[in-house]
């Protein structure tokens, strides 16, 4: 439903559903399973990006289960049984990528391979964690499989061969392999051999990082990112600044996320999606009204929001965020999901001993109804505040003073090193 810019609407919460699940435990076989000793499970974390220049491994895991079904070298990768891929328009393309990767691993057995949860937070098929989890799974059964450095070379060749659009792929690979319980993985500085990452410990103690997605956000999109060395340095410093309790908020991670987001929606060489711009307007207004919302970054597939620690469990705040987004949207929103992102470990083989170290996935989904406001009605139900849709000008977004990161225009691709 298209909504006129000057209309007022009633946004009603029809239902709110909180859930917590542990996919790793769900797919982990027990010792009572007769196939337990013949099957291996590996996990590789999905990632989210910040300011187009930093990557965090999160608790959402891509899982691969493999079992040797023939103890001989395969004649070709077509002999491997690959199952449980999500149904989408590019099934055969994905299978070709996987089989090309498997060929280069030079396996000595024929396997039955199952993939679980290969979609990232935005709903896109995430090739990097799929390949890394597959490699980790094969490590448990193969005696002379490639090491990590050769793995990176193989992955880069596959990405190049199939012309996959994965911005800053080397930083994504590093985050997936190493995890982010200690570091955010920043794109490498040109010509520098120094560790360019920032520490995540204090950020994690102070903030809830939440990925918000509406039913209007696309899942099949070509990622457009604008990494730069300047933004990379600011982001690294911002993470390190979180360590000092007396640091001014305007040089911490949430502030730089917000400034970057403001700049992104009006960047001349970027075609901003309608849902991105509307979300930007909604979150800016919300930040002015609720101190629990500390910062945000509008992205193509959703919104990365930094809340005060433990605010994710405040149903009233979650409702306010959902209603604000629905109110400012020019298209009618019918659902909003919230995923609590916890810092995830690096890729690993899953065993009974370590399966409990994987954080559960916490999610909230709100069903929403949007209708025109009748005389005497308020514009929202489910919270105490009222929200009205107002006409706005895109140029107004940039009138406020920006943090330094929003003024950087030098771009840098760490994959070109």
UniProtKB/Swiss-Prot annotation:
SUPFAM superfamilies: GHMP Kinase, C-terminal domain, Ribosomal protein S5 domain 2-like. Keywords: Developmental protein, Differentiation, Nucleus. Induction: Down-regulated by at least 4 X-linked genes, termed X-signal elements including fox-1 and sex-1. High levels of xol-1 in males correlate with low sdc-2 expression, preventing dosage compensation. Conversely, low levels of xol-1 in hermaphrodites correlate with high sdc-2 expression and the assembly of the dosage compensation complex on the X chromosome. It is found in: Nucleus. GO terms for biological process: cell differentiation; dosage compensation by hypoactivation of X chromosome; male sex determination; mRNA alternative trans-splicing. GO terms for cellular component: nucleus. Signal peptide: none annotated. Residues 391-403 have a biased composition (Acidic residues). InterPro entries: GHMP_kinase_C_sf (IPR036554), Ribosomal_Su5_D2-typ_SF (IPR020568), Ribsml_uS5_D2-typ_fold_subgr (IPR014721), Xol-1_GHMP-like (IPR015193), Xol-1_N (IPR015192). Residues 373-417 are annotated as: Disordered. Its main location: nucleus. Pfam families: Xol-1_GHMP-like, Xol-1_N. Belongs to the GHMP kinase family. Xol-1 subfamily. This is XO lethal protein 1.
